[in-house]
Structures are given as C-alpha cells and as structure tokens.
C-alpha cells in the first residue's frame, strides 16, 4: 500500500508507542480522518518521493503484541463502532482470540483501560496527536518567533503535525480553547503561557492541557523567577547553557535539558566577503545599569555594587558563582530560596557585567587598529564612535544579519554571560562560512577547538588582536578554519538536527 507522505503527516504519522500493527493502525486513522480512495497502480508510481510504501511485514519480536493494538483501536473508535452497530461484535472477536491464546484476563484488563481512556490509553494516543507551538513574541527582532517557526518547520519535515498559537495575533487567554485536549508535545519559546492561572488562582491552565510541555528559556534562569515557581507534571525547560540547567534543578526544582538553539543559513548564491570583521549586535548600556545601582537604597546598592565588582574581576565565573562570592564577602549564609530572592533583586547587575565586557572586547579590537563593522542605531552615539575604524551601518533584521555573515571573513560573538552555552549567533556565523571569534564557554570543550574558530579569554583580552590579525593575514588558514567550523555546525546545529533530537526526547520519556 502506497500512501502520500502529506496524508501520513496530517494523520499524525506512525505511532511508535504501539508494539505491533503500526501501519495497520495508521491506515485506520487516515481513513477515519480524511476521505480515502484506493487506486490500483504500478510499482513506479509507488516509488515516487512523495509516497510512503507499507507492506504486511511485522518485526518478529512484535508479532505477539497485535492484540494490544486491537484493544487500543477499540478504545479509540468505540463511539463510531457503537454507532455503526459493530462494537459488541468487535469486543467478542478480541476476547475470543484472547481465550484461545490463554491471555483472557490480561486482555480484559487491558481492554477496559483502553475503552475507559485510562492513563495507558493516552500515553499511546498522544504520540499520534499534533505538536502545539506557541509563537508571536516580538522581542529581540522577532527572534523568539523565528525559533518557534524554524523548529516547527523542521518537525513538519520529519512528518510531524504542528499547530501554532500566535500570541501576537490572539489574546493569550484564548489558549483556554486547548483545555482538556491532548498533544504529542506543547512547546513555547520563552513563553509566559505556561504561567497562566485558572480563575481559582491556584491551578495552572496547563495542568489541563495534556502532554509533555517544553519551554525554551534563553536567558539566565534568574530572569525567569516569576515564571518557574509553578510545579505541575511533565513540564521541562530547554536551555542553551549547562550551568543554567544546573541552576534550574537546584534552585527551582525544575527539570531542565541542555538544548541550544540552532543556526540558520541565508539561501543565496556565493557572495563577496567585503567585511574583515563584523559584529551583528547592540552596543549595550553599561552606564544605564550603573545608574540603576546608584538609585537603590543603601543595603541593596552596596550588594549590587559588590556583585558587579566581583563579576568584573572574575569574568569566567557564572553569575551565580560570582553572587556566592559576593555573599561570602558580607558573611551572608542563605538558604537556596533566600539566595534566589537576593539574586533576583540585583539581577540587572548581570546586564551591567555583560555590557562592560562587550565594551572592553570591542575597544581592545579597535585600539589595535582592526576595522570593525557594526549595525544598528545603538552605535550612533556610543563612546566607541571616537575610533575611526568603527564603521557603523543601519540596523539589520535577523534575515539580513545572515547575509552580513555571508559577507564577512570573520564575525565577533561576545557571550551574554553564558559560561557553558552555545547560541544561534555562534552557529549562524559558522554556517555562513565566516570564522567565529568568541569568548570561551564550557560548551566548546570537546566539541570545537581553535582549528574551527578563534577563542579568547576575557581575562586575557590583550591576546585577542594578535589572534584576529594572524587569521586575517592568512586567507588559506582562514578558509580552513571557516570550513572546519561550518562542517561541524551543519552536522550538529541545524534545526533539522534539533527536530530529530526533540523527537528522541519524546521517545525516551
């Protein structure tokens, strides 16, 4: 039997949680959900790329499990069978076979669970349900929505059925329409939807939207404190940094999984690399964070100031490790709950440290005479404009940024204090064939090295200009590094790879 792949996808694909008769059950589902016509054809037509061919072969180890699929089918279509007058006959046939094979009591028990739609029924059935994705957050040049759409498209390419709820076009309260429904998974990207409460102000809406929930969180976990104090079953956080996963587990008691965002490539012919070194990012606002510290009451001001000094002095520490040292300085011993409360109160210091080192990295490059091309309004009046080799261009969208990287021989990344992380910017630069210039992160160890990119240490910025000049002065070496980085990144950091890994997460639950 040959079936159009799109028909298979729309029906929910093969249900791998069934131990046997997977193709049979899928064909039943297709017939139940859409009009089907059987047409006799030749083998050449069946072999077309848009067709999926099924045969009658079962894996030997699964041949004795078909009765469970029969029970599941009876549970799934019980209403239709009763309406057609076949329900009792189908039950009798399944039980007669069970009697003959000596598993009558086991079958009765399992069948009752399927017809009654107990937990095991939904465990199986959810695997053929659509994946619900929340999108529509316009922050950061729409990057969160782009992530949601990229992952969704990759899942569809793997045969998954994906539904989107656009939070920009719809009131988030409209998510109530999904109450009581089951999904293969529910995915958000830095989404507040998982924090929506019911009218009783006790329970959360997603306690009643069934299926595993996954929320990408791309910042330090301290910023998400108001949204991660809820606890309900089957909720997981996807993070880009292993130290963030550790933070979630320790301080929020939340299951967190290292799952960095993937890169994207501009779909275009080869372009001339007209820039030596680019930075596609904002200048930041160190002075803004200093002003915030000055405005705080004395105890908080002192704590925030010491926190900032510690982060500046020890730039390779995680934010929480630097805050621990800050507390030690004042002789403060706190419980985990108190630690989070205190750190949340001074969380803006993290931005201060990020912007301080972004300024220092870029100024170090400029002082060495290297030309740096930057993009966006934030550079127009920044202190670094005094350097004639800082070349400012108009702002770019995410898609235009991909083109800039294609035009760059190398491009700079300064981590937003992700000490164990990997970002879409890093992946995108390498996939564009530019050499990535980045501060070190624990994620790189064992995955990339200086044959793939330029890695610098925030504690030794004096070494950075020499590293850049060395590669810019040797085009053959630059091309080797760029190609090595691109090859590794295309293998491990595409959205198609993330879709594959996400489905593995679901399969291994």
Model-inferred region functions:
Residues 184-187, 212, 236, 410, ...:
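Structural motif
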Residues 129, 134-147, 251-419, 441-444:
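Nucleotide-sugar donor-binding catalytic core of glycosyltransferases
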Residues 1-73, 84-85:
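Conserved nucleotide-sugar donor-binding catalytic segment
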Residues 40, 204-220, 236-239, 278:
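Active-site proximal beta-strand in glycosyltransferases
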Residues 221-235:
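Glycine-rich, charge-decorated loop segments at or immediately adjacent to ligand/cofactor-binding or catalytic sites
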Residues 60-121, 371:
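C-terminal, non-catalytic tails of nucleotide-sugar-dependent glycosyltransferases
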Residues 105, 119-212, 343-346, 352, ...:
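N-terminal pre-catalytic "stem/leader" segment of glycosyltransferase-like enzymes
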Residues 132-139, 146-159, 163-170, 230-231, ...:
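Catalytic binding pocket for nucleotide-activated donors in carbohydrate/polymer assembly enzymes
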